[in-house]
UniProtKB/Swiss-Prot annotation:
Binding-site list for Mn(2+) 1: D8, E99, E102, H103
Residues given in the record as Mn(2+) 2 binding sites: E11, H77, E99, E102
Source organism per UniProt: Shouchella clausii (strain KSM-K16)
Identification of the protein by name: HTH-type transcriptional regulator MntR
Chief location of this protein within or outside the cell: cytoplasm
Keywords on record: Activator, Cytoplasm, DNA-binding, Manganese, Metal-binding, Repressor, Transcription, Transcription regulation
Superkingdom field: Bacteria
Keyword Zinc: no
């Protein structure tokens, strides 16, 4: 199993390849806001763990294993963002909140959150009912 740091890289590499068709060390460094030498070290580690194939100065390609995990990590991230929106988390907090929890939640919990997201998305009335409950439970800022 990849470490949380490896997951961050795999997720970003997968996204870059989906968006651009390729992922260069410089693109990964920019996206993750890290130094290119850090990316090179992690890419070598991911290569050694068979998540990707890396050739210096030529680029990298995800293996079937890396592609499968990358896709699942992106799904997890997007699902958690959807969940946060449904439960009414302010948009300015969603990304940071998802980044804070995505590595600390089991895949079983992700599957159950997926069920819950589906439940709410299938019927807008359910989301509206949740918003009404939230309005009743929210306290004014100055109390």
């Amino acid at each position: 199993m990849p470490t949380p740091s490896m997951e961050d890289y795999l997720e970003r590499i997968y996204m870059l390849i989906e968006e651009k068709g390729y992922a260069r060390v410089s693109d990964i460094a920019e996206a993750l806001e890290v130094h290119p030498s850090s990316v090179t070290k992690m890419v070598q580690k991911l290569d050694k763990s068979d998540y990707l194939v890396y050739e210096r100065y030529r680029g990298l390609v995800l293996t079937a294993k890396g592609n499968k995990i990358g896709k699942r990590l992106v799904y997890r991230h997007e699902l958690l963002e959807d969940f946060m929106k449904i439960i009414g988390v302010d948009d300015t907090h969603i990304y940071k909140d998802v980044e804070g929890i995505e590595h600390h939640i089991s895949w079983d919990a992700i599957d159950r959150i997926g069920d819950l997201v589906q439940y709410f998305q299938e019927n807008q009335t359910r989301i509206d009912d949740l918003r009404e409950i939230q309005k009743r439970n929210d306290f004014p800022e100055d109390e």
